[in-house]
Amino acid sequence: MLRKFKISIDGKEYLVEMEEISESSVPAATPITPTTENTRAASDQKQQSQTPSPAATASAANTMPAPMPGTILKVLVNVGDTVSENQPLMILEAMKMENEIVAGMAGTVSAIHVSSGQTVNAGDNLITIA
């Protein structure tokens, strides 16, 4: 017997179907495709897309944000260094894996907002390229 549940994980709501299994029951023949109910997130996105934010300026585009929470292992560049697009800037450890943070554009490093060993959250400013 399939039963539907709505669960919330990190603020996102998911609609899931679960099958009750007993020793005498037979497993379902077809896999169930998960569906997402993001009504709150969708309405937030519509509001954001309708009103351009003043923070979306050229300087915001030059700042590299952390893609995920983790710890900065190494900073590979210094302020004043010239970098090319896709050049590794630093190493971020997340979930016991090392991830390269690469330059999204060519330019000169004008500021480094983190140091080795520092813990960062997703979206934190890491480095600014001018």
Swiss-Prot record:
Region described as Disordered: 20-64
Record's keyword terms, sorted: Biotin, Fatty acid biosynthesis, Fatty acid metabolism, Lipid biosynthesis, Lipid metabolism
Pfam families per record: Biotin_lipoyl
Cross-referenced PROSITE patterns: BIOTIN, BIOTINYL_LIPOYL
Biased composition (Low complexity): 47-64
Amino acid composition bias (Polar residues), ranges on this chain: 23-46
SS bond list: none
The Biotinyl-binding domain, residue ranges: 55-130
One example of a Gene Ontology biological process annotation: fatty acid biosynthetic process
Location of N6-biotinyllysine modifications: 96
Coiled-coil residue windows: none
Protein name per UniProt: Biotin carboxyl carrier protein
Organism listed in the record: Streptococcus mutans serotype c (strain ATCC 700610 / UA159)
